[in-house]
Amino acid sequence: MRYKTLEAFIDQVAASNPGQPEFLQATTEVIESLWPFIEQHPKYAEHGLLDRLVEPERVVMFRVSWVDDRGDVHVNRGYRIQHSSAIGPYKGGIRFHPSVNLSILKFLAFEQTFKNALTTLPMGGGKGGSDFDPKGRSPGEVMRFCQAFVSELFRHVGANTDVPAGDIGVGGREVGFMAGMMKKLSNRADCVFTGKGLSFGGSLIRPEATGYGTVYFAEEMLKRVGKSFDGLRVSVSGAGNVAQYAVEKATALGAKVVTISDSSGTVVDEDGFTPEKLAVLMDVKNHHYGRVSDYAERVGATFLPQARPWHIPVDVALPCATQNELDENDAATLIKNGAICVAEGANMPSTAKAVIAFEQSKVLYAPGKASNAGGVATSGLEMSQNSMRLSWPREEVDSRLHEIMCNIHEACVAHGGNRNGKTSYVDGANIAGFVKVADAMLAQGVV
């Protein structure tokens, strides 16, 4: 092995990527998990494999100039991280949020590579976005920004090269604007974006897929300890697409979901969600672009300003908001309150110290690369439908999604070993994803 110790490799990654804490956090977590496996299988330390694995194949950064409704010109920064094409075209979402920077997108693309490998579908890993904030912008401004963004991005993506999708700040509306501009610029109607509307090539179940998939994965985790969602108390963070459909599926399976949240605070409803309450939340968030405080006022629930949901006693926690939203103090509270299971719906929502706390406890903990892979899995199914010029019924897509999540769970269990008397889903997800990507890289030579 080129690197005698794990610390030596991490130091090299840190030195090569200064000022990128999120990327360093993600790579450290994965490599720490993989190191014992690599020591037992030294072929994965040959040919500079680890160095190549943590280095993106391509980083595209560009200026996005656009005009607001008053005629003023704004300049934002756009990115596309094409991390790995070892097992297929780059695949990963586009995020519009003021926090977007190179470190965050490199971490997301790195994680996406393993997540996509876990689905077993032929998709590489990528991620993109901009520091543009769509909140408070008119539909016309959002459209003009999306068109300006794609006027550069279109040079770097394609149905067999790189297939973006939505993410935070990028929903069906934004994907539609970008897909339309892409078609105009390229004069092609290929599947260059997933997450499209049903009227122009989208897939049924795609909006629900990440939230549904997270719950399907957690359901398999609970089955291994002889439990089900029926009658369990569940906390969900976030109130966007992932959170909404996690609430819907968990409620359908008999759980009582007692929290949702956004950046303004947390709503606690001890009576639990109902389909009617969920419809109100979707109206507030998806149509009025309001806050969870508006939802609480409409349904008579309790709103806790600037609070996170993790102090509420529950059996299952589903963090579905954003990275590093759940720290070691939150983890300690969940453990103390008797939580059985934590399954991540967001990307890396638990800090490194929180993950350690969960792994050292009796709590079943699933990292996002495994438990929230349902979104990209269904994007892969959308690509398949587009390539065949078909549209599968809702039941078929949902069935395929459920099967994929069960298979990912089985792969995690197969590679997860036994840590503290339980399966380590962290090790299982990292090793299963790594083996598929690494085997492909070794087979293709040093490229």
Where are each of the predicted segments found?
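Adenosine-phosphate binding glycine-rich loop
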Residues: M1-A26, M221-L222, I335-V447
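N-terminal ligand-binding/catalytic initiation module
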Residues: M1-I205, K436-G445
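Predominant activation on well-ordered alpha-helical scaffold segments within soluble catalytic domains
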Residues: I10-D11, T28, E32, L102, ...
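Active-site nucleophile and cofactor-binding loops and adjacent substrate-binding regions
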Residues: G71, D167-I168, S203-T210, S235-A239, ...
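General beta-strand structural signal in soluble alpha/beta enzymes
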Residues: T161-A165, A189-F193, V236, T259-D262, ...
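Conserved helix-loop functional segments at active or binding sites
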Residues: K184, E219-K227, Q323, A332, ...
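Glycine-rich phosphate/diphosphate-binding loop of Rossmann-like nucleotide-binding domains
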Residues: G197, G202-H311
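Rossmann-like adenosine-cofactor binding region
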Residues: G265-Y365, A370
